[in-house]
Structures are given as structure tokens and as C-alpha cells.
Design a protein with these regions (language model features):
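Small side chains
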Residues: 16, 42-43, 65, 71
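Short, amphipathic alpha-helical interaction segments positioned at domain boundaries
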Residues: 63-81
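Short amphipathic alpha-helical interaction segments
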Residues: 3, 32-49, 62
Length: 81
């Protein structure tokens, strides 16, 4: 069972919320200011919960699309609790 930190999830969701429809954002721990392990755990958790309109994994690198309705709801929930 994945147990990501709330702040790591908020960081990824906030970054993805800035994307336009159809674009993908490569997840880079250095760019996001997260530890690699924390970023991977949070990304897996959020992808499993359908928080992005799409995602892609190629050669161990993950990219995510804009937020789905579920992602917007989760960001709101995490940011306000």
C-alpha cells in the first residue's frame, strides 16, 4: 500500500493543474523539488487514483497530463484539510 506525503501529492497536482489539455509534463524530482522516492510514490498513488487525464511511462520516466475531475477534487481536498 502506497503512503505518499500530502505535500508531495499537492506539489505534483498543483504542477499538473497548470497544464493545458493534451500536453504532458515530465515528472522530474529536481524540477519539482521533491526526493526521487517521494515523487515516485506520490505519482504512483495519484496515477492509480486516475488523477490525470493521461499518463505515460517510457524507460522509467513518467509524464502526466492535466488534472482529471478526480485530480481536481483530490487537490482541493488535500489543500483544504
Amino acid at each position: 500500500m502506497l503512503n505518499p506525503s500530502k505535500s508531495d501529492c499537492i506539489t505534483i497536482l498543483t504542477a499538473a493543474s497548470q497544464l493545458s489539455d493534451g500536453s504532458l509534463m515530465p515528472l522530474d524530482s529536481r524540477t519539482l523539488g521533491l526526493s526521487r522516492n517521494g515523487m515516485e510514490t506520490a505519482a504512483s498513488f495519484l496515477i492509480e487514483r486516475a488523477c490525470f487525464t493521461r499518463h505515460r511511462e517510457v524507460n522509467g520516466h513518467t509524464a502526466v497530463g492535466s488534472l482529471s475531475l478526480q485530480g481536481r477534487m483530490r487537490l482541493d481536498q488535500l489543500a483544504n484539510n
